[in-house]
Amino acid sequence: MPNTKSAKKRVRVSEKRRLRNKAYKTFFKNRIKEVIKAIENGEPKEVVLELARKAQAAIDKAVSKGVIHKNQGARRKERLFKRVNEYLKSLEAAETTQE
């Protein structure tokens, strides 16, 4: 247990920040999962792109708040959009084979 007044405050502040960071992290992870689920369910192009934009915004917000490092944010966005682009290419390929 902390003894000094400042140490007690640090414990309180750290706990608040931990909970806030956890909330941001959970939020952007869920946004990413929504995109992946939409891709797996074969959702239309517009739906997937809209979800991807929301996920990108959530990741950017987590980076700006200092929850994750900017390089980690860039890596997560890159991996997400790589999956999105592969899905969009497969949709286009399916359309061209049907014609």
UniProtKB/Swiss-Prot annotation:
Signal peptide boundaries: none
GO MF annotation terms: small ribosomal subunit rRNA binding; structural constituent of ribosome
Protein name, per record: Small ribosomal subunit protein bS20
Gene Ontology annotations for the cellular component aspect, listed alphabetically: cytosol; small ribosomal subunit
General function of this protein: Binds directly to 16S ribosomal RNA.
Gene (name only): rpsT
SUPFAM superfamilies: Ribosomal protein S20
Cross-referenced InterPro entries: Ribosomal_bS20, Ribosomal_bS20_sf
GO biological process, one term: translation
Keyword line: Ribonucleoprotein, Ribosomal protein, RNA-binding, rRNA-binding
Family statement drawn from the similarity comment of this UniProt entry: Belongs to the bacterial ribosomal protein bS20 family.
Keyword set includes rRNA-binding: yes
Top-rank taxon, per record: Bacteria
Keyword presence, rRNA-binding: yes
